[in-house]
């Protein structure tokens, strides 16, 4: 992310209006940070589910493979800079596509595995008092992150869906890490 920020700073035309300048300046690095925070959130989801007594129905190898798929978006960041000028729509779309592809392919199966682990957990003994806040953080995180993701899939053009998508996702990440 720091390399992306520095690269943008070096090549963004300073003649752009301030709004466009700063949006372009932080677009690539911001998306690289989003990949990182999303991966940390997924780790937190797995940890929270296990702390609540859930057994994740995926092998460690499959989880690792899903994390590697999610990293595709991060590795695509330098390609966006090498292939397109930073002020082009193609540059911007490449970062967005990376998040949808890399993040989306990993998030869905991991989220489903966590939900299955939590559903199976409901059959066993009741949660201890110390586990209830963990479960609440996990489920609220998943709900908000998925809502933000669904809103993100509906984005077309500049409208209120963009901040709704971003805030849903970032609050989902925050709740997972607070849990």
Regions found by a protein language model. Give the residues of each.
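Alpha-helical transmembrane segments of integral membrane proteins
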Residues: 28, 61-68, 100, 104, ...
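Juxtamembrane membrane-water interface segments of multi-pass membrane proteins
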Residues: 7-24, 39-65, 79-95, 112-139, ...
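Small-residue hotspots
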Residues: 1, 36-37, 137-148, 172, ...
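Alpha-helical transmembrane segments of polytopic membrane proteins
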Residues: 27-39, 93-109, 167-174
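Selective recognition of specific alpha-helical transmembrane segments in multi-pass small-molecule
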Residues: 1-4, 64-80, 107-111, 146
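Hydrophobic, small-residue-rich alpha-helical packing segments that form membrane-like cores
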Residues: 1-4, 10-13, 31
């Amino acid at each position: 992310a720091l390399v992306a920020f520095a690269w943008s700073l070096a090549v963004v035309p300073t003649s752009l209006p301030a709004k466009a300048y700063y949006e372009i300046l932080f677009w690539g690095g911001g998306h690289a940070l989003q990949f990182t925070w999303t991966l940390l959130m997924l780790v937190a989801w797995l940890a929270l589910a296990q702390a609540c007594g859930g057994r994740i129905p995926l092998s460690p190898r499959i989880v690792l493979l899903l994390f590697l798929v999610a990293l595709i978006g991060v590795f695509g960041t330098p390609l966006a800079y090498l292939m397109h000028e930073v002020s082009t729509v193609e540059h911007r779309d490449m970062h967005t596509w990376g998040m949808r592809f890399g993040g989306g392919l990993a998030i869905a199966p991991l989220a489903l595995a966590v939900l299955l682990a939590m559903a199976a957990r409901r059959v066993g003994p009741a949660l201890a008092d110390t586990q209830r806040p963990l479960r609440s953080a996990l489920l609220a995180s998943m709900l908000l992150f998925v809502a933000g993701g669904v809103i993100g899939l509906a984005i077309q053009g500049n409208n209120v869906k963009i901040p709704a998508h971003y805030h849903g996702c970032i609050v989902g990440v925050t709740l997972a890490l607070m849990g």
